[in-house]
Regions:
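Active-site beta-strand/loop architecture of penicillin-binding DD-peptidases
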Residues: 4-97
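Short, gly/Ser/Thr-rich active-site loops of penicillin-recognizing serine hydrolases
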Residues: 82-134
Length: 134
């Protein structure tokens, strides 16, 4: 579960894979960019990738997008492969009727967890309860 939470930050506002986001779904994943090796060393050729799953809260689908020798000047996984992942995942979630994430509940729970953590920092001796928070 902790790894899934970390992978979800990749598609967050500051993440390298934010282009992989799918509207109304939490997405988690990892971008990848690698240079191709040749007999003479590393060439100016690349492989861009994005591997991810959705919904991150209850994974139903996983996909990996690999772009061999991307053209157009961009070669980073977050810029080349992540948008393709988003398009494919959005269509697959729709076709399989996977319900969107309940964002209202998600944000309420996140707020409760943060409030509990802050309260425990201030007074660690007091029992703090936040219903529904681990």
């Amino acid at each position: 579960r902790q790894v899934a939470v970390m992978l979800e930050t990749v598609t967050g506002p500051e993440g390298t894979g934010k282009a992989a986001r799918v509207k109304n779904y939490r997405v988690a994943g990892k971008t990848g960019t690698s240079r191709k090796a040749s007999a003479a060393g590393y060439a100016s050729r690349y492989i861009a990738s994005f591997a991810g799953f959705a919904p991150a809260s209850d994974p139903r689908l996983v996909a990996v997008v690999i772009v061999n020798d991307p053209s157009g000047g961009e070669y980073y996984g977050g810029l080349v492969a992540a948008p393709l992942f988003s398009t494919v995942m959005e269509g697959a979630l729709r076709l399989l009727n996977v319900p969107p994430d309940d964002y209202e509940t998600m944000w309420v729970q996140a707020g409760q967890a943060q409030a509990k953590a802050e309260a425990e920092k201030i007074e660690p001796e007091l029992p703090v309860s936040a219903e529904g928070v681990d």
